[in-house]
Structure formats: C-alpha cells, structure tokens
C-alpha cells in the first residue's frame, strides 16, 4: 500500500476509534485468536461430532425435530453440564410445559434455574434480550419458536389471517439479539418444531420446514436435527428411544456429521451406553458374543448389564471416557505450526 493510502487509512481508523470506541475496527493479525468456548451437551458422541467439544458460547443454536424426539431433553442436559461448571442458566418456557421433576432427574439444579413463562412472543424475546445484556447468563434456552405468539395474534379473533407476523418478529429480534449474544458470550438455544410445506414440491425436496421464517436459519451458527428412529426394550418393556442427531449446519467445524445415541426415559442421554458403543468401535471395549470386556475385565453380559456395571463403577467409566477422548478428539495446531504447514504445502 502506498504512503498516501496508509495515511488516509490511519486517519479513518483513528476517527472511527474516537467515535465508536477502541477495538471497533482492528486488523485480524492484531487480535489474539482464542479457541471458542463450548458447553458440553451431555452426549460425548455429539460433543465430538460438533468438533469443538459441545455447543459454542456467544452464538445462536437451533435444535429442531418432530414431537417427542428429545429436543428439550438435550437442552436440559446442556443446562445441567453448564451448572456443574458453575454457570448460570435461564429457560424461557413459551410453551408453558417445563416439568421441573424431569429436569431434576436429568441433573438440572432447578432451584438455581431462572425460569420465565411469558404471555407473548414480544415479551419472551424482550426478557431474553435483557438477560443476555446483563452479561451474567452462560446458557439460555427458548422453548419453542412455534410458541412465540405475536401480541397482535393473541389479541385478535380466532381465524384472523396475519401472514408473516411471527417471521417478522423473529427477524427483528435476532437482528437485535445477535450482537448482544456475542458481546456477553452467552449460548442461546432456540428449540423449533417441524411443519409440512403446502403446495407444489420440487423432486427431491423435503416437505418439512421449521417455523418462524428463515431468519433463524441464517443467524444460527449450529443447527441440529434430532429424530427418534427406534425403541430400546428391556424384555417387552420399552425403556427409551434410539435417537439420531444430525449436525445440519456448523460454522465452527465441518458439518453434516451424525450420531445415533440412546435416550432413556427418566434418565436422558445414556452416557454409559455411548461409552460402550464408542468403545467397541474404537476397539477399546471387546465384544465376544453377548459379553463386553474392558481392560481385560468382563463388564457385563448384554449391553444393559454392561451399562449398569459402568454406572456402578464411575472410575472405570471415567477412564474409558478419557481413553475415548484421547482417541477421537482432534489435536489442535498452534498458530505458528499451522502457518509453517501452510508454507510447506504451498512450496
């Protein structure tokens, strides 16, 4: 860059800093690049699939799927993980359907959980914005986008046609929220429902769509599609669901990874079940017939017994988890190492 351009840029930068504050504009090289903080989901498989060890702080996340697929369970487990690390959690219950007893079973400290059950969509999003701007919330869940009913719709008559009202509300709210979410380093999770598109469909196009317009699709850094794909039985009794979670969008790591995990009724995502599945895949857990062994020690006949053994021996489960993390977690290069590799590749 020639000297005249450098001087003009320097004047412009100093003027911007004077008007908008220090750090309003900066060179990327001047800024220390830090790893994105993440809150674990309670599912080791999903944490590894997300590529950063969980859901990213300072970002918007959308979790969607059919009814009873495990959307709220997943968010409550993330809240429990956050609280274990001393974080503060808030739950905006627009559906007025949160079960505190179930939340407690999943490990949520219900006494410390901030709960709001707003009357309108505007009220819900205004409360969310105020809590985010306080800078004291680590994770916030909004359940759900479909239940964020605009005030005009609530005050109107049944059958009134108000097209695009909720989509406009979401678009306006996200424009306002996103900057505050980044500044306060809060993880904000929107739970969303699926609807069927009405009209002519293109070949190969999915008839499913999420509610609340397209704004959330663009603003979300991570989008998860969660679906029940089967039942888990103990004899004739159904004790849980086999669930597939697909990372549909990920701005922080490669997307389109998917995991199949187990959600047990009254317990949530089966940590021990995941450890066994991943252990067998990584050849850390041996499976001979119906027997499972780890470290030369038999841990159970049948998956249910092996799961119970790991639950009764948490030190063994912790050791297996540490071994799996060592095997599956990507190693991070320092910036200098990364630069050297890039130079070598270029040569």
Curated annotation (Swiss-Prot):
ATP binds at residues 65-72. The keyword Aminoacyl-tRNA synthetase does not apply. It is found in: Cytoplasm. This is Protein RecA. CDD domains: RecA (cd00983). GO terms for biological process: DNA recombination; DNA repair; SOS response. PROSITE patterns: RECA_1, RECA_2, RECA_3. Residues 327-336 have a biased composition (Basic and acidic residues). One of its GO terms (cellular component) is cytosol. It holds the Pfam family RecA_C. It comes from the Bacteria. Keywords: ATP-binding, Cytoplasm, DNA damage, DNA recombination, DNA repair, DNA-binding, Nucleotide-binding, SOS response. It comes from Xylella fastidiosa (strain M12).
